[in-house]
Amino acid sequence: MSTVRSEKEAVVAEIRGKIESASAVIITEYRGLTVQNLAALRGQLRGLGTEYRVYKNTMCRFAAREAGIEGLDDLFVGPTAIAFVDGDLAASAKTLKDFAKTNPLLVLRGGAVSNKVVSAEYIQV
């Protein structure tokens, strides 16, 4: 097996582990946000027990399927970041929603709560 393939499999396993251990995952589009904006958002979420990461969409699709969550494939298009929520889902969702109000380039796409796919509207409530 090639080194590149084994590295990709390791990344997929890492993402799958994060999905399986998180109480929820929130998928966002960050097109046009600056590095400073993303760093500020990561800092806010980190304080709530949420990790906000950018991964390749293809690897996220594989990891979600391996974690047993079907229906997220359509959300992994374009510049995508994932919030892995280990803390309070409501507080993390509110932080993302409030950040999106002041930074309209951040778009909440949807996610999964307890391995069930949810819409962006569900997360924004």
Language model: regions and residue ranges:
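Positively charged, polar, low-complexity stretches
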Residues: 1-112, 117
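Phosphate-binding/catalytic loops
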Residues: 120-125
